[in-house]
Amino acid sequence: MKLPRELGPIHFVGIGGIGMSGIAEVLLNLGYHVQGSDAAENANVLRLRTKGATIAIGHKPENLGDAAVVVVSTAIKRDNPELVHARELRLPVVRRAEMLAELMRLKQCVAVAGTHGKTTTTSLVATLLDAGKFDPTVINGGIINAYGTNARLGAGDWMVVEADESDGTFLKLPADIAIVTNIDPEHLDHFKTFDAIKQAFRAFIENIPFYGFAVMCLDHPVVQELVGTIEDRRIITYGENPQADMRLVDVNLDGGMSRFNVVVRDRKAGQGKRFEERRVEDLLMPMPGLHNALNATAALSVALQLGMSDDAIRSALRGFGGVKRRFTRTGEWNGAQIFDDYGHHPVEIAAVLRAARASTKGQVIAVVQPHRYTRLHSLFNEFASCFNDADVVIVADVYAAGEPPIDGADKEHLMRALKAFGHRQAMVLRAPEDLPALIRSLAHPGDYVVCLGAGNITQWAYALPGQLAAPVSKAS
């Protein structure tokens, strides 16, 4: 039995969240009656309202109205008044991943998992399949610039989704094709141990049907280890690793672009003799960074398996519009470029700064707002050593995301640790309003100013070009 067409109102608690809003939008486009609530208005709430959703601001029992089912994310606490009332009424309450799984059962699906790179890779797969005339349905964890939204309903047979591993519910997703970009220690509040994370990813791959396949990054040692444990499922590996089936070669990251070729190895054709190889050449993507070239190689692996031509792939990559908050240029001041990036894990931060370093001959000035005290505390040494490609590091207050402070996990301690680990120029940001003056004193033509974090630093990044362009008062 599949999701009934006549279901009654579907109520989303926290409908403005990036994961919830994408599912809500596809349901709206399918003709379902969607309603919900959120703590505050945001762009996702406003967009869903224009599509016909009824959305209340604030969480109250009466918001449920005539709801037939209630959808919640793991961010919703058990004492949420709407969730409490739904259980009093004996309404079905489903997790976000369960509702996503119901939508996935309507299509053939590509699910993109990994600690980092999921959103960009999901966007790249969607872009390639779109160019290949597959007209996919897409549910992403970030705003795809070409769509202006994180979701779209396509008329084709394929769906592309971002599989969020943070609470383990990605194991509910019925994928035909699975991508794993990397596996790092993250979300230990849920998994408790790194071994548990590894086991979850193994289960994710083993859940694919025998006629499907997994695309896995051989450059990442934990993923390579996982490849060696998977039996009875078809695996396509990718990366710079010489053993990869889809080998990334000839990478050139100059000028804010990624230029590369991919060597395609056909294991079937090569049985009993040398593997047959061919090259997909002259690939260019308007996003810098080795990590993005790897993400593109993962997407290309899927596209080739589904029968897309090299020319169609080449054209789609050149036109890729990127994802909001992934190395997004927000403006320029005095020849210095300003960027906004969602990177909030040390691995992500290092990759973004490496891309910035490869793209400019000027300075790289990193402005970081650590996200969550628990993350900074558990990965403190990694944070202290992930800024090597930044000439200057400016550390702002931790964005708490509702967490209480932890001793030693704050901007002062991180700044001191950066210096202790050998960084030559690290400083704290006393207050957000001090940032423009600080950047004026540091930035020169050709420099990159990269604002990093999953909190409200995105607002600083978009405000900064205008603040820098404003006349400086004599008092300051």
UniProtKB/Swiss-Prot annotation:
GO cellular component, one term: cytoplasm
Organism domain of life: Bacteria
Pathway annotation from the record: Cell wall biogenesis; peptidoglycan biosynthesis
Subcellular location: Cytoplasm
Family: Belongs to the MurCDEF family.
Function recorded in the entry: Cell wall formation.
Name under which the protein is recorded: UDP-N-acetylmuramate--L-alanine ligase
